[in-house]
Amino acid sequence: RSDSIALAAVDLDAKSARILSLPRDTRVEIPGHGWQKLNHAYAYGGIDLLRATVGKAFGVPIHYYLLVDYGTFPRMVDIIGGVDLYVPKRLRYVDRAGHLDINIPEWQQHLDGQRALHFVLFRHDALGDIGRVQRQQQFLKAALEKLKQPEYLSRIPELAKEVVAFIKTDLTASQSVQLGGFVKELDRNRILFSVLPGKPDYLKGIS
């Protein structure tokens, strides 16, 4: 099942982007499977069914996709030398069966690939999945800020080629390079991050 889902709209001419995070437990109609949690779509039919589900739910065509898994995410982060960000509270969670041990102290932190993965995965606090979505957006903003540093800015097209090697996508190689160039020119004030609004509820005893 997909843990993080976002719908992005990129305007190459206006040099702007909008990123809408979709909480994984959002109840939607999955074609052929009825009303279920959004993240079930990927489990049932992979990226094609997830794309169809999101497109139907929001009434927009999904032209392209980017898919990153747990194994490749840390390697992508390490390509840019990790990310610096502020952690407002300690993130601590242990799942021995799942071989997961998250322990990120409060305060300003430098996150390498593995710690960055733990940061975006953590959801064991009062905000649950919404808190995780907020941290994922915080991380993405910090990563974009890192790419704006002079030593990385000129290398964005080159880095884009490296990163694409770890991503499953239907973008062509030339489109990936074009996207890298777009990120290079993108002003942080031209990126709008938002989270799909909703309210928590229980259906047949399941949240």
Predicted segments, located by residue:
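Non-catalytic, solvent-exposed segments at the cell envelope interface
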Residues: 1-207
